[in-house]
């Protein structure tokens, strides 16, 4: 093997070869391999980058996994689901999970002075990871999410802003649609615009605080106690009435610690509440099992004193009363439309999905993956792998043809040398090995040159973004590139093995050369 390698190197370094016909042919073959290898490197890098960018855009809108109620059948509207903090904690603890957040969606209508547009209103909370929205923010800022005050702020797409002539800071009306007969308007201030490049997102999605959807949909119950003066002449009696909002309207009122029943109104003597620190509580339930809400009031007479009239009757008098209130915040925020789960890597999707199904998912919940939510996009991305395979096969075929032509010409030019080697006792295998090493050396130089050219072009594109695309057609405005070492090494190894194996057949020409005729060959 050492002798074959030595002779192969001398053949390629032969100074007399400068004037031989094989020199330009070998150079052409090497240039072809360089260009073909560069095309393969760029094809793999651009395809991987494109798949990564599109997956990131789709995942950013709804997460890798979504947990919803089993009643979910419309992606534009999420039924209520009880949010279990323990379940969210269990999800965060799973290997491969990067982030967990809640969300809700409702259909809506955006109205300005002269335009109207149907949208999907997406509610997000304080547990939001803002990275995705910040990355695609065009102008302004994100709405305040998760605050106790819940300001009426909205983030809309740049497409919607241009179409409806809306500017950051403008006030728009959003009609939230509960059902055909229940459409409620609400004013929102536009805080910013975004652009993802995904038509199904940019054309219809607006973002608000999830609390607006929780209360609008009346997923929970809100209890309240109405207190008023009596009209029966008893200054120490108060009229109380239970109020409730939300639920399924088949409401039940409980007044713990009292004999009161039903909504009321009821008359109450604060003295009767002394054992409860003067507090009167109301708990509201409904027949569908909605999480109940509790409200309470404490009645405190102002300047309470007792007087005795001329008949010796002792009774209390006071100058008005003070009502302290508490509770009644509602149980709406204990419901969400669903839970989104973001993973550390897309290739962990199947493993995490299996674990969530087995360990975390409740019987009344449904788990969907991003592939199931956007099957057409992922089918398209998988089709790109077929295109890559076609390009690689074509480039390898071109390399094989180039190298076969170059090797045959080198063999023909070295016919006399082949005859001499055989006359000196070299076997056909040893002579073939010389020319296979020549071919492998030329291939190696071409592959390394192609790697260098492809990587340089890819890095220039990554750093400068000089090749741009129409975002309406390709979802990205710049050709993305994702370079990793292992795909390049696989391309190199595969190309080298296939091409060298293909050179075995033309190298067999050596076996047909007779030493006596070869020595006389000119």
Per-segment meaning from a language model:
Residues 1-37:
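N-terminal Sec/SRP start-transfer signal
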Residues 19-27, 345-400, 410-412:
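Peri-transmembrane interface segments
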Residues 40-49, 385-423, 431-434, 506-507:
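A hydrophobic alpha-helix feature that marks transmembrane segments and, especially
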Residues 47, 51-85:
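Membrane-interface junction motifs in transport/secretion proteins
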Residues 65, 160, 332-356:
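A short beta-strand structural signal in non-transmembrane regions
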Residues 80-233, 243-265, 273, 286-290, ...:
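A structural signal for hydrophobic secondary-structure junctions
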Residues 408-410, 415-461:
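Transmembrane alpha-helical interface segments in multi-pass membrane proteins
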Residues 448-491, 504, 508-512:
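Short helix-loop junctions at transmembrane helix boundaries
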């Amino acid at each position: 093997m050492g002798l074959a390698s030595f002779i192969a190197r001398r053949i390629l370094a032969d100074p007399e070869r400068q004037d031989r016909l094989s020199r330009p042919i070998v150079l052409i073959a090497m240039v072809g391999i360089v260009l073909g290898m560069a095309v393969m490197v760029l094809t793999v890098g651009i395809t991987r980058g494109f798949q990564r960018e599109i997956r990131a855009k789709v995942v950013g809108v709804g997460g890798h996994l979504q947990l919803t109620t089993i009643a979910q059948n419309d992606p534009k509207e999420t039924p209520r689901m009880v949010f279990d903090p323990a379940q969210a904690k269990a999800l965060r603890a799973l290997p491969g999970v990067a982030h967990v957040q809640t969300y809700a969606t409702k259909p809506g209508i955006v109205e300005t002075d002269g335009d109207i547009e149907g949208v999907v209103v997406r509610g997000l909370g304080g547990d939001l990871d803002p990275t995705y929205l910040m990355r695609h923010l065009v102008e302004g800022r994100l709405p305040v999410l998760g605050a106790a005050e819940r300001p009426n702020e909205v983030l809309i797409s740049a497409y919607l802003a241009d179409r409806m002539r809306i500017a950051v800071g403008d006030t728009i009306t959003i009609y939230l649609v509960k059902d055909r007969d229940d459409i409620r308007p609400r004013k929102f201030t536009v805080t910013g615009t975004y652009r993802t490049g995904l038509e199904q997102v940019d054309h219809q999605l607006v973002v608000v605080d999830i609390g607006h959807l929780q209360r609008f949909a009346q997923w929970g119950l809100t209890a309240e106690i109405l207190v008023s003066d009596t009209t029966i002449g008893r200054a120490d009696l108060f009229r109380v009435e239970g109020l409730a909002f939300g639920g399924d309207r088949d409401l039940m009122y409980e007044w713990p610690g009292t004999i009161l029943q039903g909504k009321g109104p009821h008359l109450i003597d604060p003295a009767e509440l002394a054992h409860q620190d003067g507090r009167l509580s109301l708990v509201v339930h409904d027949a569908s099992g909605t999480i109940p809400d509790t409200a309470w009031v404490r009645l405190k007479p102002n300047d309470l004193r007792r007087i005795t009239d001329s008949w010796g009757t002792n009774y209390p008098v006071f100058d008005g009363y003070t009502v302290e209130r508490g509770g009644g915040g509602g149980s709406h925020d204990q419901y969400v439309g669903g839970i989104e789960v973001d993973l550390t890597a897309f290739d962990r999707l199947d493993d995490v999905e299996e674990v969530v199904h087995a360990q975390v998912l409740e019987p009344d919940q449904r788990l969907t993956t991003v592939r199931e939510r956007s099957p057409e996009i992922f089918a398209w991305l998988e089709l790109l792998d077929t295109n890559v395979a076609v390009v690689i096969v074509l480039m390898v075929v071109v390399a094989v043809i180039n190298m076969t032509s170059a090797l045959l010409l080198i063999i023909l030019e070295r016919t006399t040398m082949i005859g001499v080697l055989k006359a000196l006792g070299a076997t056909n295998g040893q002579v073939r090995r010389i020319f296979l090493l020549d071919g492998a050396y030329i291939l190696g130089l071409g592959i390394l040159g192609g790697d260098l050219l492809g990587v340089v072009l890819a890095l220039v594109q990554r750093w400068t973004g000089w090749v741009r695309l129409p975002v309406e057609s390709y979802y990205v405005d710049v050709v993305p590139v994702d370079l990793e070492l292992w795909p390049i090494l696989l391309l190199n190894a595969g190309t080298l093995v296939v091409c060298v194996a293909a050179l075995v057949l033309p190298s067999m020409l050596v076996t047909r050369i007779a030493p006596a005729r070869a020595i006389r060959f000119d």
